[in-house]
Every structure is written in C-alpha cells, then in structure tokens.
Regions:
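The −1 position to Zn-ligating cysteines in a subset of zinc-ribbon hairpins
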Residues: 72, 86, 135
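Short coil/turn linker and secondary-structure boundary residues
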Residues: 35, 92, 113, 117, ...
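Hydrophobic transmembrane helical bundles of multi-pass organellar membrane proteins
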Residues: 72, 89-90, 146
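A detector for short metal-coordination/catalytic motifs
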Residues: 125-202
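Short, structured coil/loop segments at alpha-helix boundaries
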Residues: 53-54, 112-115, 136
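Intrinsically disordered, low-complexity peptide-like regions
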Residues: 3, 8-10, 87, 138, ...
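A boundary/linker detector
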Residues: 1-81, 169-202
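Histidine-centered nuclease catalytic patch
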Residues: 78-131
Length: 202
C-alpha cells in the first residue's frame, strides 16, 4: 500500500487545527503573527481586496450613494448622473484600517484569520466609524497621486472614533499621515473653489 494511502488526517475541533500522527506539523486556521514583513503586508492587501469585493462592502457603498443620496463630488459638486462618483476612504484608508485591526490582534496576542479581520473591518464601516468622501473618479486619482488635499470638513463618518481607539495600533508614518489629513481645511488646501467652475457656482 502506498504511504499516502496510509496517511490519516485528524482535527482538533476546539482549536480548529488539522494534524496527522505521522507528521510533526499542524495546520491552524488562525495565526498570532507573521513569519516576515512581506507575509504581513501580503495578508493586509489580501484582506483589503476581499473587503472591496464583498457584497457587504458594496451594500455599504450603495447605501451612501443611492439611499442617502451622497452622490456628488464633494469638491466639484458634479453628480453621479453626470460623472463617475467613487467613495474614498480618508481617515483611515482601507489599508490603514485593516493594518490597525491586525496590529491590535498581534499586540493583544489574540489569534485571527483573514475572515476575522474582514468581518471586523466591515463592522467598523457599518458602525460608521470610518471617514469617507465622495469624489469624482479623476479627483480620486488625483488625491492618490498626491495632487489633491481634502478639507477635513468634507469628510463624513465618525473618523474621530477611529483616531481615538485604533490609531494607537499604527506606526509613526501612519500617524503622521492622519495628522496631516486632519490639519487640512478649506483655507489651507491645495485648491480653491475658483479652480472648479461647478464648485464655484454651488
């Protein structure tokens, strides 16, 4: 009989681990840390992708745009029946939110898996504890290319809750980014209403 046919696979249903008496290694659903920085970043990006593609995330976005009718660019005031409008995560970015949730688990030594983190991130959205802005697609691209600053007064959602409760799980570079975004207002941003005719008329 082939050795592979003799392998028995068992499971510890309490800890959600697979194991075999023939091998010294186990496979756990959850982890408590990462082997490398590359694995850490790959995990965060994977969670970010799953969240964006989830039905729940789409429902959150559609609720903002279709039900609440927050469907115009906060800068140009162009509406979604004229242009493509996107929801931009401002404080925190979606990557920053996932990073904070992962770091929290690591610091508190509580095990987690991809789906724990994704569920927690979606729940933060449904608790309205993320800061977001609706932007024209080209404005969204402009922001991510470092060509646009967004006044904090335009940001919706309870981003202050995130700052108070989750920012402690981020590193200095992340905190600097948050502080710089909090400091932007209509008086010191990189553009004026006169730059956008539609906005000037609003």
């Amino acid at each position: 009989m082939d050795k592979k046919d003799q392998i028995t696979i068992n499971s510890n249903v309490e800890t959600l681990e697979l194991y075999s008496e023939m091998y010294p290694f186990t496979l756990s659903l959850r982890i408590s840390n990462f082997h490398s920085e590359a694995d850490y970043k790959k995990f965060i990006k994977s969670c970010e992708m799953i969240i964006r593609r989830s039905a729940e995330y789409k429902q959150w976005r559609d609720y903002i745009i279709d039900v609440l009718q927050i469907n115009e660019c906060m800068i140009t005031h162009e509406r979604m029946d004229e242009v493509t409008i996107e929801v931009h995560h401002h404080i925190p970015s979606l990557f920053g939110l996932v990073k904070a949730l992962v770091n929290k688990h690591i610091e508190e030594n509580t095990e987690f898996c991809t789906f724990d983190i994704c569920t927690e991130a979606i729940e933060v959205h449904f608790k309205n504890r993320v800061g977001y802005v609706t932007l024209l697609k080209s404005m969204h691209e402009k922001f991510h290319n470092g060509r646009l600053s967004i006044p904090i007064g335009f940001v919706k959602g309870d981003y202050n809750y995130f700052v108070r409760h989750y920012s402690k799980h981020l590193d200095e570079a992340d905190l600097d980014t948050i502080q710089s975004r909090l400091a932007v207002n209509e008086g010191n941003c990189s553009w004026s209403r006169d730059d956008y005719p539609a906005a000037a008329k609003a």
